[in-house]
């Protein structure tokens, strides 16, 4: 295994940095020793170096499982600019491009291959990875919090990743598996470890505290008041880059149109846009052609604009983990940034929008769980996903719910076995618990950063003293 001096020489040669930041060196040592790890590192903490450096120094191919195309392309382009052997594989590639990457994979010409969980588990890619000539060095799961997310953004393939090593066979089954995320509390960390079947992982965690982010929550009495607060906020931040987060596609479209009618250069970004439209809009915002984007949580991962001066939550996220991810888009240049969340008054009598939104997402989650229970009575107790998908709609989602609840075991990424009555968890109750945490944050009179850090089990000095910059601290409540 390489010593720290040779690792720092490689760091200097490839990236131009003289020294590692904690815990980069420790994570790299762990991976080079072929041990599993879980890394919770705030946005901008340099997590990509943790898996890119050992991949480039070691022998064989490192797979990087990533949720979004923009995230993959950004990192691969950066590596290619330095003539490093990296590629990404996703559904938006042309047929010749895809063929070229598969050829490079088969010929062992790559050190890093970025791909989504769905692409990884597709038949041509999986069969190629199982070939004896393809030597694997490790599997890195980026944005690992996706494993514990539910709702519209949930992707069932994540629940099958824990069976990767078992499916790859005896020789390749000994490779290390690492999970990286910017946000995960203790419960979510445990879920990630269990869901991925990490083997006695080393855990590295850095405080999520971002002192340059000034957190504020403002109560509104009606939809009209909410829009007027938004308008006043934007007038205060003219010529500054920022993001307006909403929870639904319809709201993104309607709110962007309302802003355009009032002269603001804002556009809507959501999951319904095609790949070309998404890239075009991302570039317009990154290059300053527009100052703000009204977006759902489809926007953000892999988009790095250091001078983002504000984030406004027109509708609050339902989970504290999502909130921390989204405000983390601001202030990456370490300069002060304002993060404002607009919320309905607590009773919901005058403006029931927030309450209805929570009820809607809980209702959707409940429907998924009910569907899973019905399907579990209809499908064979043991079976192959590919053979059964055509006969059972929503099979993948149902199997993911059953796996999360402890009723199902993946024998490999394609074959399952149901364990009836073997309940380990109630996903719906866990979701309600996460919603309550978010509500506590929005209604607290304590320091907002302290509230977040306590919720995430952070023991740093920042968790023991008021931040001095949030709205509660500024009015003397802390």
Swiss-Prot record:
A GO cellular component entry from the record: replisome
Reactions the enzyme catalyzes: Couples ATP hydrolysis with the unwinding of duplex DNA by translocating in the 3'-5' direction; ATP + H2O = ADP + phosphate + H(+)
Domain Helicase C-terminal: residue ranges: 229-380
Comment field (misc): Cyanobacteria do not encode always the HRDC found in most bacterial RecQ proteins.
Protein name: ATP-dependent DNA helicase RecQ
InterPro entries, per the entry: DEAD/DEAH_box_helicase_dom, DNA_helicase_ATP-dep_RecQ, Helicase_ATP-bd, Helicase_C-like, P-loop_NTPase, RecQ_Zn-bd
Motif (DEAH box): 142-145
Family to which this protein belongs: Belongs to the helicase family. RecQ subfamily.
Binding site for ATP: 41-48
Top-rank taxon: Bacteria
SUPFAM superfamilies: P-loop containing nucleoside triphosphate hydrolases (SSF52540)
Function: An ATP-dependent DNA helicase which unwinds DNA in a 3'-5' direction.
Every Helicase ATP-binding domain range: 28-202
This protein's record includes keyword Iron: no
Lineage: Bacteria, Bacillati, Cyanobacteriota, Cyanophyceae, Synechococcales
Organism whose genome encodes this protein: Synechocystis sp. (strain ATCC 27184 / PCC 6803 / Kazusa)
Binding, Zn(2+): 447, 467, 470, 473
Example GO BP: DNA recombination
Annotated cofactor note: Requires Mg(2+) for helicase activity.
Molecular function as annotated in GO: 3'-5' DNA helicase activity; ATP binding; ATP hydrolysis activity; DNA binding; four-way junction helicase activity; metal ion binding
Cofactor(s) in the UniProt record: Mg(2+); Zn(2+)
């Amino acid at each position: 295994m390489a010593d720290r001096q040779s690792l720092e020489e490689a760091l200097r040669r490839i990236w131009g940095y003289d020294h590692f930041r904690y815990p980069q060196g420790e994570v790299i040592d762990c991976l080079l020793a072929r041990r599993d790890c879980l890394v919770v590192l705030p946005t901008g903490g340099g997590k990509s170096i943790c898996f890119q450096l050992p991949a480039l120094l070691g022998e064989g191919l490192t797979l990087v499982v990533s949720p979004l195309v923009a995230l993959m392309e950004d990192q691969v382009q950066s590596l290619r600019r330095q003539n490093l052997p990296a590629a990404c594989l996703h559904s938006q590639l042309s047929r010749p491009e895809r063929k070229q990457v598969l050829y490079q994979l088969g010929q062992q010409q790559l050190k890093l291959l970025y791909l989504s969980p769905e692409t990884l588990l597709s038949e041509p890619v999986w069969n190629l990875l199982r070939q004896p000539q393809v030597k694997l060095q490790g599997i890195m799961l980026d944005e690992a919090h996706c494993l514990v997310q539910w709702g519209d953004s949930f992707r069932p393939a994540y629940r099958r990743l824990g069976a990767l090593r078992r499916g790859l066979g005896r020789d390749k089954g000994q490779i290390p598996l690492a999970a990286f995320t910017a946000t995960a509390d203790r419960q979510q960390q445990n879920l990630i470890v269990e869901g991925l079947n990490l083997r006695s992982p080393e855990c590295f965690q850095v405080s999520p505290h971002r002192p340059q982010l000034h957190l504020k929550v403002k109560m509104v009495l009606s939809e009209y008041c909410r829009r007027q607060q938004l308008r006043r906020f934007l007038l205060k931040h003219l010529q500054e880059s920022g993001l307006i987060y909403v929870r639904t596609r319809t709201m993104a479209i309607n709110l962007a149109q309302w802003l355009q009618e009032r002269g603001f250069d804002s556009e809507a970004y959501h999951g319904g846009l095609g790949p070309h439209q998404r890239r075009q809009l991302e570039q317009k915002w990154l290059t300053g052609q527009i100052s703000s984007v009204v977006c759902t949580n489809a926007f953000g991962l892999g988009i790095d604009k250091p001078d983002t001066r504000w984030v406004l939550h027109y509708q609050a996220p339902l989970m504290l983990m999502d909130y921390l991810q989204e405000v983390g888009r601001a202030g990456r240049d370490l300069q002060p940034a304002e993060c404002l969340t607009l919320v309905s008054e607590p009773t919901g009598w005058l403006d029931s929008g927030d309450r209805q939104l929570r009820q809607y997402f809980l209702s959707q989650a409940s429907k998924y769980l009910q569907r899973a229970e019905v399907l579990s009575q209809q499908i064979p107790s043991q079976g192959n996903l590919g053979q059964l998908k055509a006969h059972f709609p929503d099979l993948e989602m149902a199997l993911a719910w059953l796996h999360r609840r402890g009723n199902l075991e993946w024998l490999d990424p394609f074959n399952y076995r149901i364990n009836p009555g073997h309940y380990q968890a109630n996903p719906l109750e866990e979701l309600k618990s996460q919603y309550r945490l978010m509500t506590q944050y929005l209604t607290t009179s304590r320091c907002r950063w302290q509230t977040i850090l306590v919720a995430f089990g952070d023991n740093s000095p920042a968790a023991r003293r008021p931040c001095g910059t949030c709205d509660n601290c500024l009015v003397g409540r802390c």
